[in-house]
């Protein structure tokens, strides 16, 4: 069952607020006996902080490239998620990237997804868990030919750890190491909120939203059966840079009828297409939704994606408007007729300094 096919169960389950506007519910509460691991959800706690990394990256069958760089890992949601950013150089090359790690309380597993500054697109997720001090996640490689990928964390101490990426072309029977890194902790305060350079290009479209905002939300919990019933939420929306000109994160914490809720929006800029991709996640489900895609024009940002409701493909639209130095406005709506008419599902206003 897809997230939108659970539309009829919306009122019975908590909602992911940042994707509620697109009719995207939270995962239902865990049933008795489901996997719950307090230790597992803190498996990446060793990783938080700033690290020096020494990398060997395979360039060909017989050639390895050496690189050095910095890794900064930030805890989110009390350790149930973390955001890693890496910058490294060597042998005439340089790259920036970020990795989002999310803990799924239902499965008891972690997922990770990587994006490079070259295109701002999240790779397919890898899944796995830690056991006996060793973390192993599996998925598909993100470059070119699809190979099985295995990421491994080992030899973890308070001051160092080892990381490897390996690939397999035979379903996991044999593995070839592609990336080897040894990391040593740096005794410095992590630079989570990256200083940003002011600019007018499209990569700076979300600069207006940086900071800590008070937010008020009105949302329709079930736009098909009860489009006239609105529910109110209040809380904070904190937005900060991950990388200066291609990535930022918005963290939403609000209180509503179902209690306290935490959501995240990861916004990545694609320099090739000059578009933004906005990925959503919430702490209850620990999964990353497919992105909305769009751009700003004339001070208005419009983002859309396709979803299914009742077996029909529908459009979901998010519009940013009314942008001033101290406030901004969002409207969300869904359309079942290709955009001819829209059913509003979300209205929010962020206010700075109140």
Each language-model region and where it sits:
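Intrinsically disordered/low-complexity terminal segments and short unstructured peptides
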Residues: 1-3, 18, 49, 173
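C-terminal segment of classical bacterial N-terminal signal peptides
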Residues: 18-28
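A general, composition-driven signal for non-globular sequence regions
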Residues: 8, 21-22, 261
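Bacterial N-terminal signal peptides that target proteins for export
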Residues: 2-16
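Hydrophobic small-molecule pocket/channel-lining residues, especially in calycin-type beta-barrels
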Residues: 30-354
């Amino acid at each position: 069952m897809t997230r939108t096919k659970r539309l009829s169960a919306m009122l019975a389950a908590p909602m992911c607020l940042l994707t509620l506007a697109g009719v995207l519910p939270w995962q239902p509460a865990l049933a008795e006996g489901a996997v719950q691991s307090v230790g597992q959800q803190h498996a990446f706690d060793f990783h938080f902080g700033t690290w020096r990394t020494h990398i060997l990256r395979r360039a060909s069958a017989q050639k390895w490239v050496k690189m050095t760089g910095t890794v900064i890992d930030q805890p989110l949601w009390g350790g149930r998620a973390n955001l890693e950013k890496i910058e490294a150089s060597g042998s005439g090359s340089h790259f920036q990237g970020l990795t989002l790690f999310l803990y799924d309380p239902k499965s008891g597993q972690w997922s990770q997804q990587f994006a490079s500054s070259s295109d701002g697109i999240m790779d397919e997720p890898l899944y796995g868990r830690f056991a006996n001090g060793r973390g192993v996640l599996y998925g598909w490689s993100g470059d070119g030919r699809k190979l099985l990928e295995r990421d491994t964390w080992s030899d973890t101490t308070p001051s160092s750890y080892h990381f490897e990426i390996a690939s397999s072309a035979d379903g996991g029977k044999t593995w070839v190491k592609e990336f080897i890194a040894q990391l040593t902790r740096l005794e410095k305060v992590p630079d989570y909120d990256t200083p940003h350079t002011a600019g007018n290009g499209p990569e700076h479209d979300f600069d207006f939203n940086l900071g800590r905002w008070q937010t008020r939300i009105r949302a329709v919990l079930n736009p098909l059966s009860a489009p006239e019933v609105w529910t109110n939420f209040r809380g904070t929306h904190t937005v900060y840079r991950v990388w200066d000109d291609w990535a930022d994160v918005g963290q939403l914490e609000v209180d509503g009828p179902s209690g306290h809720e935490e959501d995240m929006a990861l916004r990545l800029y694609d320099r090739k297409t000059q578009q933004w991709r906005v990925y959503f996640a919430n702490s209850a489900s620990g999964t990353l939704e497919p992105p909305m895609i769009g751009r700003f024009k004339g001070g208005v940002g419009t983002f859309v994606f396709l979803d299914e409701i009742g077996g029909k493909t529908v459009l979901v639209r998010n519009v940013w408007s009314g942008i001033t130095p101290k406030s901004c406005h969002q409207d969300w709506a869904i359309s079942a007729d290709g955009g001819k008419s829209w059913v509003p599902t979300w209205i929010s206003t962020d206010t700075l300094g109140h």
